[in-house]
């Protein structure tokens, strides 16, 4: 896992250069948004179960996927879906704090789409639930932090699509 600081420094180091004004601007932006990201992470951590519960109610609960024959019909499948959504929220929060998507590639997206396809997990419904997580999260953390968190939830959605 990288963070924004490591990514900026590594990019300059690979070129054997000091940090240029663009790199310093990226670091400045990262540090300026630090308090916002930490407050958002605290709110998300304190409300993670509520976020997932509301997202499921918004996106999946009354759809065909939860009816007999649907991919979330049995209690075991439903619990697995909830577990996965909690996992996406947690890792998106880590990525937001780090200001970098590498943890999402390493720990979430690497092979996930293929696994879901082989198990018959409906990717469209999963993406819909992730977008609902984004909406619910934004309503709790506010518009600025919601946009920041949305970047990482959208990254997961794009990686699955």
From Swiss-Prot:
The keyword Ribosomal protein does not apply. It is a peripheral membrane protein. Contains one covalently linked phycocyanobilin chromophore. The modification N4-methylasparagine is found at residue 71. It is found in: Cellular thylakoid membrane. Keywords: Antenna complex, Bile pigment, Chromophore, Electron transport, Membrane, Methylation, Photosynthesis, Phycobilisome, Thylakoid, Transport. GO terms for cellular component: phycobilisome; plasma membrane-derived thylakoid membrane. Its main location: membrane. (2R,3E)-phycocyanobilin binds at residue 81. Disulfide bonds: none annotated. GO terms for biological process: photosynthesis. Belongs to the phycobiliprotein family. Heterodimer of an alpha and a beta chain. Light-harvesting photosynthetic bile pigment-protein from the phycobiliprotein complex. Allophycocyanin has a maximum absorption at approximately 650 nanometers. This is Allophycocyanin beta chain. It comes from Synechococcus sp. (strain ATCC 27144 / PCC 6301 / SAUG 1402/1) (Anacystis nidulans).
């Amino acid at each position: 896992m990288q963070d924004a600081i490591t990514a900026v420094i590594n990019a300059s180091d690979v070129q054997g250069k000091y940090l240029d004004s663009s790199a310093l601007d990226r670091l400045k932006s990262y540090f300026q948004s630090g308090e916002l990201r930490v407050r958002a992470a605290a709110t998300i951590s304190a409300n993670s179960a509520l976020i997932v519960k509301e997202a499921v109610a918004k996106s999946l609960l009354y759809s065909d996927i939860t009816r007999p024959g649907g991919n979330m019909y049995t209690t075991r499948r439903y619990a697995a879906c909830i577990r996965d959504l909690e996992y996406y929220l947690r890792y998106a929060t880590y990525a937001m704090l780090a200001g970098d998507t590498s943890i999402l590639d390493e720990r979430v997206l690497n092979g996930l789409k293929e696994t879901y396809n082989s198990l018959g997990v409906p990717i469209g419904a999963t993406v819909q639930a992730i977008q609902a997580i984004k909406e619910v999260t934004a309503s709790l953390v506010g518009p600025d932090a919601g946009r920041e968190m949305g970047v990482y939830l959208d990254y997961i959605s794009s990686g699955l699509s």
